[in-house]
Regions:
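Periplasmic/cell-envelope proteins involved in peptidoglycan metabolism and beta-lactam response
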Residues: 22, 114, 125, 132-143, ...
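Terminal amphipathic helices with adjacent charged low-complexity linkers/tails
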Residues: 95, 103-104, 149-150, 154-156
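N-terminal structured subdomain of primase-like DNA metabolism proteins
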Residues: 1-102, 159
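Phosphate-handling DNA/RNA-contact segment within nucleic-acid enzymes
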Residues: 13, 28, 103-122, 132, ...
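Phosphate/diphosphate-binding loops
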Residues: 307-310
Length: 310
């Protein structure tokens, strides 16, 4: 990311607005605001924000910095990810000096919105009478009730060629956008849904945005793979994603422990059993990028203090 873009983000992102998304701030006088620190347990507010200087500081745990470092710390993001998050927040187009270009802010938002709406569509379909019953029965056979399915956003992809495509095109998305988002693919007579007659799990990046899906076949007559994932897209990079991480990140950082299990239902079962540090890979082997992501959650004062359990 170009230095002038970083400088622009740092100086135009109001730190009190950004912090205010996580902390209830109150005026503290002298141009400062204060609230309960999000980085340690406390009953009296010792977390201060100075909007005029763009800095925050906690007098309890001695953490502090600017708006970028705040997002890095609270969302467990890298520097680049934090800058990109803030750029998205203010709809600012970043430029890059070298390396692969990132999907433009407006394009990225369209892809994220398409996936968000797709997740809601699939969730609604799971509750419909008829063909979705096989999906509900599968979940019940694994010990998951309606509340569990809702907690993890599990859905059902209808056994139709273009049910999702029609739904999203009715909301203004184009065939090109839906294919780029990994939701449809080119068929013999136009674009068709990528997932059909499958149980679907939304896959989130660490920030919580839905970036793709994992889908399990429900019919023995389905000759496709047992599990099918969103293909690589501008927002879905399977080597850098862990299923359940957006739910587990706070507990992982707090307990200095992460439990890596095999699949989506294993993550569900673990969390419902109280093991809230469980995550799983998304149809790929556990690799270096996954380790890099988890190290950020398990680091304490630049030292690795935690355990990874398989």
């Amino acid at each position: 990311i170009r230095d002038d873009d970083v400088s622009h983000i740092r100086h135009t992102s109001r730190i009190d607005d950004v912090v205010g998304d996580y902390v209830q701030l109150k005026n503290a006088g002298g141009g400062q605001k204060k609230g309960l620190c999000p980085f340690h347990d406390e009953k009296s507010p010792s977390f201060h924000v100075t909007p005029s200087k763009g800095f925050y500081h906690c007098f309890g745990c001695q953490t502090g910095g600017d708006v970028i470092s705040f997002v890095m710390k609270i969302e467990h993001m890298s520097f680049t990810e934090a800058v990109e998050r803030l750029a998205d927040r203010m709809n600012y187009q970043l430029t890059y000096d070298e390396g692969p270009t990132r999907t433009g802010g407006s394009d990225r938002k369209r892809l994220l919105e398409a996936n968000r709406l797709a997740a809601l569509f699939y969730q609604e379909q799971l509750q419909q009478p008829g063909p979705a019953q096989v999906g509900r029965e599968f979940l019940q056979s694994r010990g998951f009730d309606k509340a569990a399915a809702a907690k993890f956003g599990v859905g059902y992809a209808p056994d139709e060629w273009d049910a999702l495509a029609k739904h999203l095109k009715g909301r203004g998305f184009t065939d090109a956008e839906l294919e780029l988002a990994g939701l449809t693919k080119e068929g013999q007579r136009g674009h068709i849904d990528r997932f059909r007659n499958r149980l679907v799990w939304p896959i989130h990046e660490i920030s919580g945005d839905v970036v793709g899906f994992g889908a399990r076949r429900l019919s023995e007559s389905d000759t496709g793979p047992k599990y099918l994932n969103t293909p690589e897209t501008p927002i879905y990079k399977k080597s850098a994603l862990l299923y359940g991480l957006e739910m587990a990140k706070k507990e992982i950082a707090k307990k200095r422990q992460v439990v890596v299990v095999e699949g989506y239902t294993d993550v569900m079962a673990a969390h419902l059993a109280g093991i809230e540090t469980a995550v799983a890979t998304c149809g790929t082997a556990f690799g270096d990028e996954h380790i890099r992501i988890l190290r950020r959650l398990l680091m304490d004062d630049d030292a690795f203090r935690g355990e990874v359990i398989f």
